[in-house]
């Protein structure tokens, strides 16, 4: 089996004061210009050795170039990012209950950045390169589709951050057709790039301060979900309950509260966590018509300047009600 694809994006965004604007104090107009180009390509190759045991090997190759030239008044941020990724995977089933998946991967990132953070500063440059080879193994136990246990372990070596190990586990219990329960736990790491991820903040008049000791982000995350399929009036009422918790051990914090004249990118010094609870109900009242209601409660807090506070711009409550209708032939859906 072979797959390949390419993708290209070219975008130009402008904003700020219009060209017809004439300032009375002789100051130049403020404008924003963001030009983006992105090119992607990938290939997927797979070969099946044994169909009965689903023994197969697969190779995935992908690459991308992301180029952005951004101007926010006097402030400038230009970046060229090259990414290359390769993954070799092997899967097999020992029997109907036990299976194994393992593989090797290689990821390459190269950020070539130039920026000017104030009209009084010279244009600066930075080059960030990271090569990350890694390997993983994953074991799955499946007991008659009623109990499924999946455990995995991944190890990577970063040319910038060193070695890190990522464990992960999933459990699914489905004793009958009406109820199933899922649980998961694991660890995650992420490399941070302060300006590449947050250059929109340059539109502010605040001074940008980036601490030199920013480290890789590290967090534990846990989740549990339950699904009920309840027969009701010859139809099925679907109920879903979900809860997820993330505990950050290391994190890049964007602090805009400690100093009203600064945007400070700093390392987490204290607690940072996220609690998310969601409930959802869906019911087909008549043929083609389905009504869905959902409610989400989010509690996200981070330590800013030694004080644990709610993270800004994260809605605590969210509700959603949707109605969907599909015509009898399935051609139209509203």
Which residues are covered by each model-predicted region?
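Repeated loop/turn-to-beta-strand initiation elements of outer-membrane beta-barrel proteins
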Residues: 2, 12, 50-57, 96-100, ...
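Transmembrane beta-strands of outer-membrane beta-barrel pores
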Residues: 8-12, 63-67, 106-112, 153-159, ...
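Flexible loop and strand-edge segments within Gram-negative outer membrane beta-barrel domains
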Residues: 1-57, 63-81
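Residue-level signature of outer-membrane beta-barrel architecture
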Residues: 47-49, 88-94, 141, 155, ...
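Surface-exposed extracellular loop regions of Gram-negative outer-membrane beta-barrel proteins
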Residues: 1, 51-73, 99-109, 114, ...
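Gram-negative outer-membrane beta-barrel transporters
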Residues: 142-144, 239, 243-247, 265-334
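Membrane-embedded beta-barrel scaffold of Gram-negative outer-membrane proteins
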Residues: 56-70, 174, 180-182, 213-267, ...
